[in-house]
Curated annotation (Swiss-Prot):
Keywords: Antiport, Cell inner membrane, Cell membrane, Ion transport, Membrane, Sodium, Sodium transport, Transmembrane, Transmembrane helix, Transport. Residues 1-13 have a biased composition (Basic and acidic residues). It catalyses: Na(+)(in) + 2 H(+)(out) = Na(+)(out) + 2 H(+)(in). This is Na(+)/H(+) antiporter NhaA. Signal peptide: none annotated. It is found in: Cell inner membrane. Pfam families: Na_H_antiport_1, Thioredoxin_4. It comes from Anaeromyxobacter dehalogenans (strain 2CP-C). One of its GO terms (cellular component) is plasma membrane. The keyword Ion transport applies. The gene is nhaA. GO terms for biological process: regulation of pH. Residues 6-198 form the Thioredoxin domain. Residues 199-644 are annotated as: Na(+)/H(+) antiporter NhaA.
Length: 644
């Protein structure tokens, strides 16, 4: 159901613009070793600043001045470590090797470092040789003096930069953790000294980047809801969620139970996030090409048809027959959390497969809610909703990207859909469709514009004109550049995704997962429980596996060699963790509280069984022979002069 975990859990392959680069490592690898690293300052200082830089990088020369200011501010409390990460410039690697050679030949690294920082970032022909002679180094000949060892040290630093996720220079690590703030001395000093705000920000980022974090929050929220529901406060807890909440004006009002505000209101934000992700996948993501999408699409369709068919086989008719929708969806937060906890037992390609399949799941689940779980349709309000949708589409066509008109019309659309008898969460999906997108920006042009603006402000600062920071025209220009870098749809997704993952879904679990176990809770509802459990635990993996095999046999899809059919079946078993979306559809399908209670128990049991089954199937590692067959032969390559 939620793919934020999936994005954190997998690296993005080339040509995959959906998620940008894969998640970068947060920790320095390897840690600082005073016996190997170049350390400036007290070896036992309590603050450590590590910089990956290049002598041919102009930004590193600016950072050099900032580091000097930090050392003046913090004194003996700070130790500074410089590691080489040569950029793509002709003199970058020779300059790095020169500094390392000076360190090996008489421990003069910092002398060479300062010389190179003063004279760079551009070095004239023969200038590096002149610096080497000034330092008393022997001629640069292969195997002569310290040069061979220096080249090896640069390669080691480049490999360290790769493992630490360094993709630009300079990159800083503070006390072993990646620093992602501004490069000015004040911000770096605040981070080094560990202000409360910085520590809270760092802890929040660490938790959000941990792939199982959303699943963990859902588990905690569910456990709290179940515990309270089965305690002496259970009745009050249930009554609180049923309390009406709304607005009234002049004798007129609009009110809904609190739980309905959660299910119809808050979940609209979630459906907006889902819609934005589906839109991006269909345009530039994993479902943009038939070859990439064929296998997960086939598996997803089989994984929805088979569970629904098994459910209807057990309950073919009657008031409970409408509950088949509870068996067709997957809670990605839990499924991906288990995949991540299994570590390298699960190939990255398998995570990609499951995530793409769930995107199709979500798309169909949205259609199912709209078509099968809406109330009686009011034609006037339906026409009003269509008119609002047309206005939203007009905003898109007019290239209006400001948020307020979309927010206002989105709220109006929600009200029209609610009054029309359709599920109002569809407003989120419609908003996702009409939110503007645009082609990727010309980063070269925008970089030049930003540099021109900032250089003009820098000149004004030197002339003493600026007293209170950049001028208002400069700030407006920088705001316009920033807005152009990211499309409105991407920006909206990036903004709302954490709220959907860490606020909306846990609140939904609190409001809906609290099931009180009472004697006779399942009396007369054994077939309902069996239908849901059978659909999720057996139907999901069976349908996904058979549909995928059929698609491959028919030549419609190709299975990656990185994972075996057994592992695909294990992913199918994990797809049986319905939970949040299953609970949501169950709330629409079973108006009788007793039926809903039994359905919740069945969904809990099925999700638990599916998770255990999937983990057991995926636990065995592939044999070495199978791994050798599955993976392409490694290509020998050396680190190039850019350190990549």
């Amino acid at each position: 159901m939620n793919r934020a975990d999936a994005r954190r859990a997998r690296p993005a392959p080339e040509g995959r613009p959906m998620s940008g680069p894969g998640p970068l490592p947060v920790r320095l690898d390897p840690p600082v070793d005073p016996a190997r690293d170049h350390v400036l300052g007290e070896p036992g200082a309590d603050l450590t600043l590590v910089e990956y830089g290049s002598y041919a990088c102009p930004h590193c020369h600016v950072a050099h001045e900032v580091v000097a200011e930090l050392r003046d501010r913090l004194g003996d409390r700070l130790r500074y470590v410089f590691r080489q990460r040569p950029i793509r410039a002709e003199a970058a690697r020779p300059a790095a090797e020169l500094a390392e050679a000076a360190g090996l030949d008489g421990e003069r690294f910092w002398h060479a470092h300062d010389l190179l920082m003063r004279r760079g970032p551009s070095f004239a022909a023969g200038e590096l040789d002149a610096i080497a002679r000034e330092l008393g180094l022997p001629p640069r000949e292969r195997g002569a003096g310290p040069w061979e060892g220096a080249a090896a040290r640069v390669r080691e630093d480049v490999e360290s930069a790769r493992r630490s996720g360094v993709h630009l220079t300079p990159t800083f690590f503070i006390n072993g953790r990646r620093y992602e703030g501004p490069w000015d001395a004040a911000a770096l000093s605040e981070a080094l000294l560990g202000s409360l705000g910085h520590r809270l920000h760092a802890a929040t980022l660490d938790f959000a980047r941990w792939a199982p974090s959303t699943g963990l929050l859902l588990v905690v929220a569910t456990a709290i809801a179940v515990a309270i529901a089965n305690s002496s406060a259970g009745a009050a807890f249930t009554a609180a969620w049923q309390a009406p909440l709304g607005l009234s004006l002049g004798g007129r009002g609009f009110a809904l139970p609190l739980v309905q505000w959660v299910n119809d209101g808050l979940l609209t934000l979630f459906f907006l996030v889902v819609g934005l992700e589906i839109k991006r996948e269909l345009t530039v993501g994993r479902l943009a090409s038939w070859r990439a999408a064929a296998l997960p699409m086939a598996a997803a369709i089989g994984g929805m048809v088979a569970p629904a068919a098994l459910y209807l086989l057990v309950i073919p008719a009657g008031p409970l027959a409408g509950g088949w929708g509870t068996t067709i969806s997957t809670d990605t937060a839990f499924a991906v959390a288990i995949l991540v906890l299994l570590g390298d037992r699960v190939p990255v390609d398998l995570r990609v497969f499951l995530t793409a399949a769930v995107i199709v799941d979500d798309l169909v689940a949205i259609a199912v809610v709209a078509l099968f779980y809406s109330g009686a349709i009011s034609l006037p309000w339906l026409l009003a909703a269509a008119a609002v949708t047309a206005l939203l589409a007009g905003l898109n066509r007019a290239a209006i990207s400001a948020a307020p008109p979309y927010v206002a019309l989105g709220a109006l659309l929600w009200a029209c859909l609610h009054a029309a008898g359709l599920h109002p969460t569809l407003a989120g999906v419609i908003l996702a469709v009409v939110t503007p997108t645009r082609p990727p920006p010309d980063l070269r042009a925008l970089t030049g514009q930003a540099q021109a603006v900032l250089e003009a402000e820098l000149r004004r600062a030197r002339e003493g004109v600026l007293r209170h920071g950049p001028s208002e025209p400069a700030l407006r220009a920088l705001d316009a550049i920033h807005d152009r870098i990211e499309s409105p749809a991407s920006k909206l997704l990036r903004t709302l995704d954490p709220w959907a993952s860490y606020a909306v879904l846990p609140v939904f679990a609190l409001a809906n997962a609290g099931v009180a176990w009472v004697p006779g809770a399942l009396d007369g509802r054994g077939r309902l429980v069996a239908a849901i459990v059978l659909g999720l635990v057996a139907g999901k993996p069976l349908g996904m596996f058979l549909a995928a095999r059929l698609a491959v046999r028919a030549g419609l899809a190709v299975k990656p060699a990185a994972y075996a059919w057994r592992q695909l079946a294990g992913a199918g078993a994990l797809a049986g963790i319905g939970f949040t979306m299953s609970l949501f559809i169950a709330g629409q399908a079973f108006p009788d509280p007793a039926d809903f209670r039994a359905a919740k128990i069945a969904i809990f049991a099925a999700s638990l069984l599916a998770g255990v089954l999937g983990a057991l199937v995926l636990w065995p590692r592939r044999s070495p022979a199978a791994e050798a067959e599955a993976l392409p032969a490694p290509e020998g390559s050396e680190v190039d002069a850019a350190g990549t």
